[in-house]
Amino acid sequence: MSKISFDAQSISNSLRAAKHQPRKRFGQNFLHDRSVIREIVESIRLERDDNLIEIGPGMGALTEPLLAEVDAMTVVELDRDLADSLRIRIGANSHPNFTIIKDNAMHVDYRELYSEERGKLRVVGNLPYNISTPILFHLLSYADVIEDMHFMLQKEVVERITADVGSKTYGRLSVIMQYHCHTDYLLTVPRGAFNPPPKVTSAVFRLTPHIIKPVVAEDEEYFALVVRETFNHRRKTLRAIFKKSTLLPTLSEDDFAACAIDPQARPETLNVKDFVNLSNQARTIPV
């Protein structure tokens, strides 16, 4: 790995040199802790020919050590000042296979970055915490061309994504993400690893899209509706939720039995397969 020159002072100096103030609306908190950067890069386990995409590179604290591990890399940066700074520092003159896309990560067609020659995408990034969930769901729509994703988010959100069934943090995000991907909690990142420090502790996690889903919902939009509606009333029993919801049908004892689910159970006790079976059964019944 190449020498990592980022620390709190160098980040501050770079921001001043670029006349750039971290923008709250972009959720800009710049990573500078060398040991954390090293841990993140090592956890990704890159190969030279990987089709690497970084979302929100910021000042390039992760970008440069990542680029040292691969032959080519694409970054997506909405902030034009930061994109221009990256282009000057590590652009075409120093690395001809470094591409910058100046755009909102939510507007990028990631399928265009895939090719049989370059392979599936390996996506990394320190996502803006204020819009992280929409970005994750946007990326899931390209799961068939993504090998894996490594992201840094608020620790509490990562705990929800990777939660085990029955735990306090298990919920809608756990079920939806684990339906589409295998999830791994990798490491915790303290507030002091950033400049300026965020208000919360962060964590890094991995999403690996299922090549073949272990269970398949007949209607994924309806599956998502069932998951959302049930967790909106997580303290109630499933029987009560389906009886009172205006969006879901009332289920009979036979309906629950067909899913092998106890109608007295609560949402946090159901695994992904249970939710799939429940949604497949419920969608056949008029509301």
From Swiss-Prot:
Catalytic activity line of the entry: adenosine(1518)/adenosine(1519) in 16S rRNA + 4 S-adenosyl-L-methionine = N(6)-dimethyladenosine(1518)/N(6)-dimethyladenosine(1519) in 16S rRNA + 4 S-adenosyl-L-homocysteine + 4 H(+)
Chief subcellular location: cytoplasm
Record Pfam families: RrnaAD
Localization terms from the record: Cytoplasm
CC per GO annotation: cytosol
InterPro entries associated with the record: KsgA/Erm, rRNA_Ade_diMease-like_C, rRNA_Ade_Mease_Trfase_CS, rRNA_Ade_methylase_Trfase_N, rRNA_adenine_dimethylase, SAM-dependent_MTases_sf
Highest taxon above the source species: Bacteria
EC number, as in UniProt: 2.1.1.182
Binding site for S-adenosyl-L-methionine: N29, L31, G56, E77, N126
GO molecular function ontology, one term from the record: RNA binding
Keyword set, alphabetical order: Cytoplasm, Methyltransferase, RNA-binding, rRNA processing, S-adenosyl-L-methionine, Transferase
Class of this enzyme: transferase
Biological role: Specifically dimethylates two adjacent adenosines (A1518 and A1519) in the loop of a conserved hairpin near the 3'-end of 16S rRNA in the 30S particle. May play a critical role in biogenesis of 30S subunits.
Family: Belongs to the class I-like SAM-binding methyltransferase superfamily. rRNA adenine N(6)-methyltransferase family. RsmA subfamily.
NCBIfam families assigned to the protein according to its UniProt record, in alphabetical order: ksgA
PANTHER family: DIMETHYLADENOSINE TRANSFERASE, DIMETHYLADENOSINE TRANSFERASE-RELATED
Name the record gives this protein: Ribosomal RNA small subunit methyltransferase A
Organism: Psychrobacter arcticus (strain DSM 17307 / VKM B-2377 / 273-4)
Protein's gene: rsmA
